[in-house]
Swiss-Prot record:
It comes from Burkholderia cenocepacia (strain HI2424). It is found in: Cytoplasm. It catalyses: tRNA(Arg) + L-arginine + ATP = L-arginyl-tRNA(Arg) + AMP + diphosphate. The gene is argS. A motif ('HIGH' region) lies at residues 138-148. This is Arginine--tRNA ligase. Its EC number is 6.1.1.19. The lineage of its organism: Bacteria, Pseudomonadati, Pseudomonadota, Betaproteobacteria, Burkholderiales.
Length: 593
């Protein structure tokens, strides 16, 4: 039901409960009513709304739950405000209260969608608050892999979901550009620049084997200039002995490549934060010094340890090794201090499940600083692995990366790119990229983050209802076609439909579709509160299913004006909600397919 109706019904039920409690216990008796919880029954025949408050209160009030439910229903239906909202009420099982909404209450969603348009489903309840989402945060040592793709989809969609509730959302990418892996990138590029390739004598053991390294070396030797979206241009010097110059060029080259991958995926960031800046600005040392002064550390075996067990970790952790280098979670603590200092009191990190062990360490470090950061800061969404299948076989390598499937591979394959074009993005037309982007974004968000996901390229290419993104997009396109035909055959424009007589919508299929439309705002709120962006994909599939059921049951383009326009109005509202939901996912809503 619509949020306004839900709030009204919750208030009416709460008042009814209060009346019954006073009648049973006396007006002066101490009584704390539980929060009213409304749910949609799993079986449509049981009504539109179910409430279990009678079973919660039966024992405290010393009465039978079914009798209590009957008294609550009597008090509810006696209230004038309920009579235009509730059509019928019945008691089920041990004391469930099942309510049927009035036809007018169900139909109200159509007017709400027409009135609010693209804003339908959104809320300003969190207006004035801000949240930082950090996601992808890949090392600039190679192309983005499918795990980064899942992070990008989760992060970007979750950002849209949270923004729908009024938050100002800041998207941030943390570049791990300081560490051993960057050194390995430099020596890999240097080896390629010297004419070596994997398997040759002299090829570094820790080197990266992907063909992209050869591309970097070639451009470095040719004196090409590269630049990331937020950085200064770097020119290749061609000097194979200057490892620092090679490192700078290779990092910038790969940052540019990752920018291109993200652009193809429809993901934009507000800020890129460099790990190296934490060292150059002295933030890592400052954080370590503060933890030492706070008594949160001790020295043992030549290493500096953090008392993470004080904050619930299973053992204390090394911060600074005996060789003077820091372990990887130390700059993470310093980085999160910057988030707090920048005013982000709500922070969400989206990372692979292999980062689970760092959560307690980072939080312990932040608590040990005693600077007002609350426990549980930051929040985390951890995702599991993605397996790619093509032609019934698991795909483990690609020409582009050498040892893993890249995001760009996935987009191009899912868009139908011909074999052999994977390493030549300039050969891929925009329509292929759009199809691929839509499929990959929808697929990667269509499961809970904490479940492993099998990405089936063959399924992504299917143009039938087995393919979830096609199924949802086709529903939108089908409605567009019907509304175009409405205009050409009957000269009725969508702008005229808000005046339709909605009392014509009497079928069970119409009622079910209207109820599903009305659930959209609450679904978005739930997805934001629970950090569950997959809920949007689940909802859209269900909505498309309700549309198809309605459309298959009732002819829309009939000569009788009243039922025709009412049904067309329902379709127009459905089209708008499909478009709104697809926009949250960053997926296109085609008018033709």
């Amino acid at each position: 039901m619509l949020p306004a109706h839900k709030q009204t019904l919750e208030a009416l039920l709460a008042d009814s409960v209060k009346q019954v409690a006073h009648a049973l216990k006396g007006a002066d008796a101490a009584f704390v009513a539980p929060a009213i919880t409304l749910e949609r029954p799993k079986v449509a025949a049981h009504g539109d709304v179910a409430c279990n408050v009678a079973m919660q209160l039966a024992k405290p009030l010393g009465t039978n739950p079914r009798q209590l439910a009957e008294q609550i229903v009597a008090a509810l239906t006696a209230q004038p405000a309920a009579q235009g909202l509730v059509e019928a009420a019945e008691i089920a099982g041990p004391g469930f209260i099942n309510l049927r909404l009035s036809a007018a209450a169900k139909q109200a969603v159509i007017a709400a969608v027409f009135e609010q348009g693209r804003a339908f489903g959104t809320s300003d309840r969190e207006k004035g608050k801000q949240v930082l989402l950090e996601f992808v945060s890949a090392n600039p040592t190679g192309p983005l892999h499918v795990g980064h793709g899942r992070q990008a989809a989760l992060g970007d969609v979750l950002a849209n979901v949270i923004a729908s509730q009024g938050y100002a959302v800041h998207r941030e990418f943390y570049y791990n550009d300081a560490g051993v892996q960057i050194g390995n990138l430099a020596i890999s590029t240097q080896a390629r620049a010297r004419g070596l390739k994997p398997g040759d004598a002299g090829w570094p053991e820790a080197a990266y084997n992907g063909e992209y390294i050869a591309d970097i070396a070639r451009d470095y030797l040719n004196g090409e200039t590269v630049a990331a979206s937020d950085g200064e241009p770097v020119k290749g010097t061609g000097d194979v002995e200057d490892l620092d110059a090679i490192r700078k060029f290779a990092v910038t080259y790969l940052r540019r490549e990752q920018d291109m991958d993200l652009q193809a995926f429809g993901v934009k960031f507000d800020q890129y934060y460099l790990e190296s800046s934490l060292y150059s600005e002295g933030r890592v040392e400052k954080t370590v010094d503060a933890l030492v002064k706070a008594g949160m550390t001790y020295e043992q075996d030549g290493a500096l340890w953090l008392r993470t067990t004080d904050e619930g970790d299973d053992k204390d952790r090394v911060m600074r090794k005996s060789d003077g280098t820091y372990t990887y979670f130390v700059p993470d603590v310093a980085y999160h201090v910057t988030k707090w200092e920048r005013g982000f009191t709500k922070v969400i990190n989206i990372q692979g499940s292999d980062h689970h062990g760092t959560i307690a360490r980072v939080r312990a470090g932040l608590q040990g600083l005693h600077i007002g950061i609350p426990k549980g800061y930051p929040d985390y969404v951890l995702h599991k692995m993605v397996t790619v299948m093509r032609d019934g076989q698991e795909v483990k390598i690609s020409k582009r990366a050498g040892s893993y499937v890249t995001v760009r591979d996935l987009i191009e394959w899912s868009g139908g790119a011909a074999a052999g074009q994977e390493a030549a993005p300039d050969l891929i037309d925009e329509a292929t990229i759009t199809r691929g982007r839509d499929a990959v974004r929808f697929f990667l968000i269509s499961r809970k983050a904490d479940t492993e996901f099998v990405f089936d390229i063959d399924l992504a290419l299917k143009q039938n209802d087995e393919n979830p993104v096609y199924y949802v997009q086709y529903a939108h396109a089908r409605i567009c076609s019907v509304l175009n035909e409405l205009k050409s055959r009957y000269n009725v424009d969508v702008a005229q439909l808000p005046g339709a007589d909605l009392s014509q919508l009497t079928s069970a299929q119409a009622a079910s579709l209207m109820q599903k439309l009305a659930e959209y705002p609450d679904m978005l709120t739930h997805a934001a509160n629970e950090l569950a962006p997959h809920a949007v994909a689940f909802y859209l599939r269900d909505l498309a299913g309700e549309f198809h059921s309605f459309y298959n049951a009732e002819r829309v383009l009939v000569d009788d004006e009243a039922p025709r326009n009412a049904r067309a109005a329902l379709l127009a509202a459905t089209r708008q909600v499909l478009e709104n939901g697809l926009a949250v996912l960053g997926v296109s809503a085609p008018a033709k397919m």
